[in-house]
Design a protein with these regions (language model features):
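N-terminal secretory signal peptides
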Residues: 1-9, 20-29, 33-36
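Extracellular low-complexity, O-glycosylation-prone Ser/Thr/Pro/Gly-rich "stalks"
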Residues: 40-397
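N-terminal export leaders
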Residues: 10-15
Length: 397
């Protein structure tokens, strides 16, 4: 698998675009179009991928778990029906309560088997309740969905235990990941079979409880834990007034001060960039000249703003490496980036302790704790160009 900083900017490109990690509520899906013009909505695809859902949560029986598969095909908002076909999102789908009911019930017992056609989107699971997706008109007058935003207290889905995985399935293959970029709630595992047999996202025994306990006990982080329902990512916590907007400022300032007097080297697929802070901008020379303003704590946590990563092959990959270095707090200790030894991550007092906690919760140490977590391949991401099946498991908690 090609490392994140050596791919065209990754999670938003190959998996899903919902406004990046900083989706606001109500979140209207704006998934990136894929080359699927030959796939009419509603067709039963001969190359549909077998999708198996396994409820091993140990806390909820199958009757208490509901599935929602929503996303995009050829730029159009779609959802998977229980019959395995894609249906376009329509404003008329809203019921008397103002929301759609796109739930797919699990089998009465055992595994639930579905067929996944070419599309890009999310697989949501809701435990003990139903999710409320609202069909609305987007800026062009087309039907779109407002997605759950479990980190927003006023969201109608705030009280529902839920989580999701992300994927793109097209002629090139299956590209998928579990995600904790926005929050961590339900432990999910993905197994992708095909040319290889790969599993990612598996939370270790007791890992969920340990992550909740760790974050709850950290100064400045405790308010991110919502009962036993979810941990909100600190970027969303910042927007909600639950996390210090200047939390990382001392570390950011020290990075800026340090690299006023020495070089930082960043290696990407384009080559090696050498940078110094000049006039309060971190300017890199190399295959191209790129520069960045001093980021805020919010910019770092969302990997956006001053660290926005355009899909240009130069600025974007350097921004991704910087974003990962800030979140993992490796920029001062390692003047050559990216850092590839996980034992060097999160070793300072000021770091993304949320990302550290969710990585520690997984069996293989991989997680999507922030948007650039796939730099140096530490994200819970897998892909296969010849897939034969995808298995999503709600693991025990």
């Amino acid at each position: 698998m090609t490392p994140r900083h050596q791919r065209p900017v990754g999670r938003r490109k190959v998996l899903f675009a919902l406004g990046g990690a900083a989706v606001a509520a109500p979140a209207v899906a704006a998934l990136a179009p894929h080359a699927l013009a030959e796939d009419p909505v509603g067709r039963t695809a001969a190359d549909a991928l077998p999708l198996t859902i396994v409820n091993d949560s140990g806390s909820f029986d199958n009757a208490s778990v509901r599935l929602y598969i929503v996303g995009n095909q050829d730029g159009r908002q779609v959802r998977l029906t229980p019959e395995g076909t894609l249906a376009p999102v329509s404003l008329s789908d809203n019921g008397p309560d103002g929301f759609t009911d796109y739930a797919i019930e699990l089998a009465g017992s055992g595994e639930t088997r579905l067929s996944l056609p070419h599309m890009s989107g999310r697989i949501y699971v809701a435990l003990g309740g139903r999710l409320k997706f609202k069909a609305v008109a987007d800026g062009d007058g087309n039907a779109a969905l407002q997605y759950p935003a479990g980190w927003v207290e006023s969201d109608p889905n705030y009280g529902v235990l839920h989580d999701c995985a992300e994927f793109t399935y097209n002629a090139a293959g299956m590209f998928c990941n579990t995600t904790m970029v926005d929050m961590f709630s339900v432990p999910l595992s993905l197994r992708l079979t095909g040319a290889d047999d790969q599993t990612t996202g598996t939370v270790r025994d007791g890992g969920r409880a340990a992550a909740f306990e760790t974050v709850r006990g950290l100064e400045g982080y405790s308010r991110l834990v919502v009962d036993d329902t979810r941990i909100i990512a600190p970027g969303h916590g910042l927007d909600a007034g639950l996390f210090d907007k200047d939390y990382l400022a001392p570390y950011i300032d020290e990075v800026w001060s340090t690299y006023t007097g020495r070089d930082l080297k960043v290696t990407t697929n384009a080559g090696t960039f050498t940078g110094r802070v000049r006039g309060d901008r971190f300017t890199f020379d190399g295959p191209a000249q790129v520069s960045f303003g001093r980021p805020s704590t919010r910019d770092v946590l969302f990997c956006d703003g001053a660290l926005a990563a355009p899909n240009d092959g130069t600025t974007g990959p350097v921004a991704a490496v910087l974003g990962a270095g800030f979140n993992r707090s490796t920029l001062l200790s390692h003047p050559e980036q990216p850092t590839t030894d996980a034992s060097d991550f999160y070793r300072t007092d000021l770091t993304n302790h949320y990302a550290k906690a969710v990585h520690e919760a997984t069996e293989d140490g991989r997680a999507y704790g922030f948007a650039f977590d796939d730099v140096a391949d530490f994200a819970s991401y897998i892909q296969d160009t010849a897939p034969t099946g995808l298995r999503l498991t709600l693991t025990r908690f």
